[in-house]
Amino acid sequence: MVLVLDFGSQYTRLIARRLRELRAFSLILPGDAPLEEVLKHRPQALILSGGPRSVFDPDAPRPDPRLFSSGLPLLGICYGMQLLAQELGGRVERAGRAEYGKALLTRHEGPLFRGLEGEVQVWMSHQDAVTAPPPGWRVVAETEENPVAAIASPDGRAYGVQFHPEVAHTPKGMQILENFLELAGVKRDWTPEHVLEELLREVRERAGKDRVLLAVSGGVDSSTLALLLAKAGVDHLAVFVDHGLLRLGEREEVEGALRALGVNLLVVDAKERFLKALKGVEDPEEKRKIIGREFVAAFSQVARERGPFRFLAQGTLYPDVIESAGGHGAAKIKSHHNVGGLPEDLEFELLEPFRLLFKDEVRELALLLGLPDTLRLRHPFPGPGLAVRVLGEVTEERLEILRRADDIFTSLLREWGLYEKVAQALAVLTPVRSVGVAGDERKYGYVLALRAVTTEDFMTADWARLPLEFLDEAARRITRRVPEIGRVVYDLTSKPPATIEWE
């Protein structure tokens, strides 16, 4: 396995994901993790991430210096390379000007660049620069702007690269990372089949004959977890709370798919309860609080009536764990708890089999477990459901309008082969009414916003460049089939500054 030491780079998670794509298990630790903690994980190699700081800052994050004499293979990326060079006696200088964007390696040599020929495009993002390698080290790559773009240790077990091999803008970056894994002798058995085998063993050993309670939303994480519990043969109850805020046909689709695959599923019809609690509420934060409160009440009632349960299973993913732990260069984002706010008298032990997995790895497991593509490849859907896509007060009438429009948009994306090319797509019903023409008469109808984004990690996202012909057909079909909607607009805002959801 490979440990990635995090010094605050926006790409740290991407490094870990890229390694797993190469079938090498990886974990992220804080950059200043002591040697004892590092060795506890028995890594076969270490990667020092980039970071936003300068190695000249007095309070810049630094690794335990004992790591450099540990004998472990090392790869320093950007800031990580500068730390490596500075610690081992090389020279790092404040660059005359920052180097950001695409660059070309005009020279590269050695096993780290095996299989690469000619000039190689890479992505730079640094201010300081290594101007001389440590004693005995060699310069193994350069660009026109940077004569020290990569360095190698005398024994060939440690390297530094000034660029970012993990990003898409370094097209041959995966080859460079793979070369490093081979040089380090890293075991590469992190396959979906191996992961599934390990998770089944873990769940069976942990749960034993005790009962497990799970809340399912119809999303890929909780649905896959329900299938895992069923395949493991543990005594479980999966609870699907229908809060009346679902998309068109969603309850029937989720219920049918999970029951067919052997999940012990209980569906709770709580539509009236939720809509009554939301009556007259327009503030988005208040809506979220009410929905959370009502969900907890419905879930708690099931737990008491059908209990006792020893474990509460959650589809917590590795990014949730990372965000909860915090790290260098970023404040702690949140304390993660998927089913937060449960009463204290409901005493559960948490069972989180996916706590070390990324979303794409869960999708791979879902494929092995037989989850239908309609659920496996489904776009993310917020816990509060359509309540945060109906701006203003949530009513059954407005929900029904949005359901029909959203279904048309999603169906069209599938028809055009675009659904799997965007990371998330949604329709938002605004409280704005716009004047239009129906026949010979003026008519006021709702303004509907369509949104689609592309992203790798949902931390940042770009608006999807859908064909104008597609958007034209979507607007025509929606206004024709949903007469309550008089105007359709398309959201061209990226994240940041906007969030993906409107509320």
Curated annotation (Swiss-Prot):
Catalytic machinery residues: C78, H164, E166
RNA-binding listed as a keyword: no
Pathway(s) this gene product operates in, as recorded in its UniProt entry: Purine metabolism; GMP biosynthesis; GMP from XMP (L-Gln route): step 1/1
Protein EC: 6.3.5.2
CDD domains xref list: GATase1_GMP_Synthase (cd01742), GMP_synthase_C (cd01997)
Keyword Ligase attached: yes
One annotated Gene Ontology cellular component of this protein: cytosol
Domain GMPS ATP-PPase: 190-378
One Pfam family matching this protein: GMP_synt_C
Chain positions recorded as ATP binding sites: S217, G218, G219, V220, D221, S222, S223
Listed SUPFAM superfamilies: Adenine nucleotide alpha hydrolases-like, Class I glutamine amidotransferase-like, GMP synthetase C-terminal dimerisation domain
Glutamine amidotransferase type-1 domain location: 1-189
UniProt keyword terms in alphabetical order: ATP-binding, Glutamine amidotransferase, GMP biosynthesis, Ligase, Nucleotide-binding, Purine biosynthesis
Reaction equation(s) it catalyzes: XMP + L-glutamine + ATP + H2O = GMP + L-glutamate + AMP + diphosphate + 2 H(+)
Record GO terms (molecular function): ATP binding; GMP synthase activity
PROSITE patterns per the UniProt record, alphabetical: GATASE_TYPE_1 (PS51273), GMPS_ATP_PPASE (PS51553)
Its biological purpose: Catalyzes the synthesis of GMP from XMP.
HAMAP family membership: GMP_synthase (MF_00344)
Entry-linked PANTHER family: GMP SYNTHASE [GLUTAMINE-HYDROLYZING], GMP SYNTHASE-RELATED
Subunit structure: Homodimer.
Protein name: GMP synthase [glutamine-hydrolyzing]
Organism, scientific name: Thermus thermophilus (strain ATCC 27634 / DSM 579 / HB8)
Taxonomic lineage of the native organism: Bacteria, Thermotogati, Deinococcota, Deinococci, Thermales
